[in-house]
Regions:
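Class II aminoacyl-tRNA synthetase catalytic cores and aaRS-like
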Residues: 1-201
Length: 203
């Protein structure tokens, strides 16, 4: 096996283990939820479809982990997470694959500030365990995870890094025009908020 490919496999395994180690230590419970579902919700994606012969029922492969995890929260499990495969029957490019591993977590009695704290600490924990430090080389840059993460709204981020102010964009047509100007691909179904999200990904 090519050494670089081997290193990627080893590093991925360490990352998954480190995520589990951190979340378990924070009181989260790892769960498994159904892959075959009657209603594939939780994301805007086209599902793969199949047929269950024993019940003569059409089923779908899940496109996200969200809905069953939220049911567990409502049922009284206050901190849950899942690392599992999801399937999306759509485009194929550098950011889209028909099947991929997704991690989702949910916890009760917190807000988005608590979730940001959790995310920031998770990244630091994984980086420290997997690489032995908090300074990560990325191309010509070094990402320093020891510093507090910038906390900024999506609108402010696009304005700061792409010089586009979505507060000044009044309607969908104007948003589409801005997207075309910046070579951001979008679909007919995308609304202004979707184009804002695509703009953030683009930068």
């Amino acid at each position: 096996m090519n050494q670089e490919v081997k290193d990627t496999f080893v590093k991925r395994s360490k990352i998954i283990s480190s995520i589990r180690h951190y979340l378990d230590g924070e009181g989260f419970m790892e769960v498994e939820t159904p892959m075959l579902v009657s209603n594939a919700g939780g994301a805007a994606a086209r599902p793969f479809e199949t047929h269950f012969n024993a019940l003569s029922e059409d089923l779908k492969l899940r496109i996200s982990l969200e809905l069953y995890l939220k049911r567990l929260i409502v049922g009284g499990l206050e901190r849950v997470y899942e690392i599992g495969r999801v399937f999306r029957n759509e485009g194929l490019d550098t950011r889209h694959n028909p099947e991929f591993t997704l991690m989702e977590l949910y916890q009760a009695y917190t807000d988005y500030h608590g979730m940001m704290d959790l995310t920031e600490n998770l990244y630091r924990h994984v980086a420290q365990e997997v690489t032995g430090g908090l300074q990560l080389p990325y191309g010509e840059h070094v990402i320093d995870l020891s510093k507090p993460f910038e906390r900024i709204t999506m609108v402010d981020a696009v304005k700061k890094y792409a010089n586009v102010d979505f507060n000044e964009i009044k309607d969908l047509e104007q948003a589409r025009a801005v997207a075309k100007e910046h070579h951001i691909e979008f679909e007919e179904r995308h609304k202004k908020g979707d184009i804002l999200n695509l703009s953030l990904i683009h930068i």
